[in-house]
């Protein structure tokens, strides 16, 4: 089943309004491919029917969760993007820690948005352990990680990874 330009724009804008994910027009094929199975499973006839289902059906909340699952890309790994992590570890984090120490508040909050299966927030925890070493136990540190996908969050909570992920 092929998605029309109008259907794509309708769904793209709806997805953006619901979860903040913007899908460029050159990625229309992704929407078509990823949503075609949902449309079949719901016995709908078109992408317009799916859009209306998402907006008006009584079970739309459940379907929104499934929509978020299929439109998100869960690219993740431990120590992903080394140059960025190096700047965080050697420049950003030490500056923040020094400011906290000077203020007499050894409290740190980090938010990992779009954490997928958890490799990024666990990487941040490892970096904190390496930077703070023996001082770690005197700090109040919380890393909050979230994602639109409940399935990947469940994997992140388990914190069990295979050799390939490591």
List the predicted regions and their residue ranges.
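Aromatic-flanked redox-active Cys/Sec active sites in thiol-based oxidoreductases
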Residues: 111-117
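Active-site catalytic pocket residues across diverse enzymes, especially alpha/beta-hydrolases
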Residues: 92, 96, 128-132, 160
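Conserved AdoMet
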Residues: 1-111
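Alpha-helical elements of the RecA-like P-loop NTPase motor core of helicases
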Residues: 86, 122, 154
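Conserved SAM-binding loop of SAM-dependent methyltransferases across substrates and taxa
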Residues: 117-136
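Extended basic-aromatic, gly/pro-enriched interface segments that bind polyanionic ligands
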Residues: 113, 134-166
